[in-house]
């Protein structure tokens, strides 16, 4: 019982399509090798899958370029002539653009002005003025941007300086005050005689005969 006839149409499932392509490609390559060996033919095959993967086969006695050259000789035409002519036209167009730009540059530098008419000179002057305004605008923009950047750096440096000053000020403040027997209260400073007064304790008189006496330096008990 023979196999049923397969309808030739595009396989919608991508996986099935790729599997079928791989199998058929292998079969075509096998037939091409058989033709090369059995019939001494020059065969070239170039294939691209739907995913863009490239495959080729060429008889060992030649190469792809040789096959294309023989093909062009056989049909009497060139495969590259149209592309070559397009490249020539593109090159000529680019040369014209380059020549015009060089002429414009020289004219803006004050050269090659002898052949220009009044209207052309006036148009050139307007173009130069417009370019000058654009350059000035760009210059001022750069200056403004740099100035703002420098201001931010200066502000940041000043804030860091103030923070450092505050930290240093806190570190230099003494941890204790000392008693000033002269009635001045607490003093955070440290003089030459402050060490003796740092830990001064005042003795409160408890004897009746001591009531009413001034608390002078003779009634102070000092440590060390």
From Swiss-Prot:
Keywords: Activator, Developmental protein, Differentiation, DNA-binding, Flowering, Nucleus, Transcription, Transcription regulation. GO terms for cellular component: nucleus. Transmembrane segments: none annotated. InterPro entries: MADS-box/MEF2_TF, MEF2-like_N, TF_Kbox, TF_MADSbox, TF_MADSbox_sf. GO terms for biological process: cell differentiation; positive regulation of transcription by RNA polymerase II; regulation of transcription by RNA polymerase II; specification of stamen identity. It comes from the Eukaryota. The keyword Cell membrane does not apply. One of its GO terms (molecular function) is DNA-binding transcription factor activity, RNA polymerase II-specific. It is found in: Nucleus. The keyword DNA-binding applies. Residues 84-174 form the K-box domain. Expressed in lodicules, stamens and carpels. Gene3D superfamilies: Transcription factor, MADS-box. Residues 1-61 form the MADS-box domain. Pfam families: K-box, SRF-TF. Probable transcription factor involved in the development of floral organs. Required for normal development of lodicules and stamens (whorls 2 and 3). May function as a heterodimer with MADS4. Inhibition of MADS16 expression by RNAi reduces expression of MADS4, and transforms lodicules and stamens into palea/lemma-like and carpel-like organs, respectively. May interact with the K-box of MADS4, MADS6 and MADS8. May form a heterodimer with MADS4. This is MADS-box transcription factor 16. It comes from Oryza sativa subsp. japonica.
């Amino acid at each position: 019982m023979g196999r049923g006839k397969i309808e030739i149409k595009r396989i919608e499932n991508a996986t099935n399509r790729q599997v079928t392509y791989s199998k058929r490609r292998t079969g075509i390559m096998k037939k091409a090798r058989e033709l090369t060996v059995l019939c001494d033919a020059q065969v070239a095959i170039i294939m691209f899958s739907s995913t863009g993967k490239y495959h080729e086969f060429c008889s060992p006695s030649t190469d792809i370029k040789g096959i294309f050259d023989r093909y062009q000789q056989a049909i009497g035409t060139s495969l590259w002539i149209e592309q070559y002519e397009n490249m020539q036209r593109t090159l000529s167009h680019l040369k014209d653009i380059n020549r015009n730009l060089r002429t414009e540059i020289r004219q803006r530098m004050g050269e090659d002005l002898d052949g220009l008419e009044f209207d052309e000179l006036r148009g050139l002057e307007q173009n130069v003025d417009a370019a000058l305004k654009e350059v000035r605008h760009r210059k001022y923009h750069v200056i403004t941007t740099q100035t703002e950047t420098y201001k931010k750096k200066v502000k940041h440096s000043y804030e860091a300086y103030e923070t450092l000053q505050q930290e240093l000020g806190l570190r230099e403040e003494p941890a204790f005050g000392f008693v000033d027997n002269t009635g001045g209260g607490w003093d955070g400073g440290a003089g030459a005689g402050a060490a003796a007064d740092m830990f001064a304790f005042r003795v409160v008189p408890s004897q009746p005969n001591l009531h009413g006496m001034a608390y002078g330096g003779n009634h102070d008990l000092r440590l060390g």
